[in-house]
Amino acid sequence: MKQYTDLFIDFDDTLYDTYGNAEIALHELFDALHLERWFPDASVFYDEYWQTNIDLWTRYSRGEITRDYLIVERFRRPLSKGQGLEPDEKRCLEVSDLFLDLLSTKSGVVEGAHELMDYLRSQGYRMHMCSNGFHEVQYRKLRSSGLYDYFDTIILSEDAGTNKPSARFFDYAMQQTRAGKTTTLMIGDNFQTDILGAKHYGLATAYFNRYPQYPAPEPVDYEVTSLRQLMDIL
């Protein structure tokens, strides 16, 4: 008898290649808005955006800032640096809407994502997506990437009213899925939000470490460096 019946699976950069897809979308945004007027090239704009975005998402996951602040600020900062003039909130929202429209059409997945999900489905696991991503974008990304139909349940932080790694997020996920703590495994690439959140809640964890030169800072149940390695565990 298998140890787990339910899998909580992170989406962004665990299955969906958010980093790669965002790079493509930001280059398209750069061209559409003619940002070469303020940046030497698209890579400079991309680097400015990504550094800001990582910082803001970390703070958002900790509940320190709101969704609306993140959406505006992640474009206000890089555009301010490039233009030397701070854009107003309306302009930042327009840029954000265009970026999210571009991103949500991208279909790139992490290597081995479809093979893994096909395998897990064949083994009879119940699969539940657990994500801090925004509601209106995640469903479009799920469909663009061909991953939507694999999931039994979609758990989003906006529906839960709180973000991973909060215990309240996992309370909500357990209620929605009717999963049991001892038979549920959390799979994710973000050690702080996915792995520590689930571990502190009492769930087993599988850390997808995409950068193996930086091993897990504390013990986990499983650590893999590719999605295909999860097939050997499950």
Task: Give the residues covered by each predicted segment.
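Active-site neighborhood of HAD-like aspartate-dependent phosphohydrolases
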Residues: 1-9, 14-51
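Alpha-helix N-cap/helix-initiation sites
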Residues: 19-23, 39-42, 64-68, 85-92, ...
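Alpha-helical elements of Rossmann-like donor-binding domains used by nucleotide-donor carbohydrate transfer enzymes
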Residues: 24-28, 48, 74-77, 115, ...
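Short, surface-exposed acidic
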Residues: 34-46, 81-96, 150
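A metal-dependent, Asp-based hydrolase signature
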Residues: 51-98
